[in-house]
Amino acid sequence: MAVDKGLDEAEGLPLGEATFRALREALRSGIYKPGDRLREEEVAERLKVSRTPVREAFGRLVSKGLVVPGQGRGLIVRRLDQTEVVELYAMREILEGAAARLAAKHASGPEVDALRDLEEGFEKATSADEMARFNRLFHECIFASSRNRYLDSALQELQDAIALLGRTTFTVEARPVAAFREHRDLIEAIAAQDADKADALARAHIRESLRARLRIMQQG
């Protein structure tokens, strides 16, 4: 749900929930980046809602640790420090390895085809941000293919923290090519129903992503 559109299409959801989901998606997609300021009146105007559901959504974002009060009015999107980043990737390695293992056992033919289509989109992407979008969809497809609602829920929570990382690792030299190769090998392991290999490849993929992330952080 784009952050600059109204919430008319969010039928069946309380307005506060729809507003929260719109803001969370804006964070995940990089519309709002670490350090950006969110103001009630601006968000309300963009989403065409009153300030009451925005205030409710802001409270949930604060409770989840995604934003912090800024000086003056509004909230600031948090930026993770290096310790938090290392902890986040350690958890990603465990959970995404488990998701890949389960996907190798449960993924359907159409789901494997969807992974291949997403990887083709990643390969053809012309910008780092576009690669990041396909990458997120790729990983979410694996989460869904795991057939484990609790694991999927935990991984979705991590997606919120990933939104606080800032610049995509696909801006690091040679990382897009390496990530494409890692994704391709992971797809083949899932397609072959090789759970051990899929787990190991997913974990290695996250470790390589962490190395690229730390390079970005060292550059400042």
Labelled PLM ranges:
Residues A98, K105-T168, F180-A189, K197-R207:
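Conserved amphipathic alpha-helical segments that form helical-bundle/coiled-coil interaction surfaces
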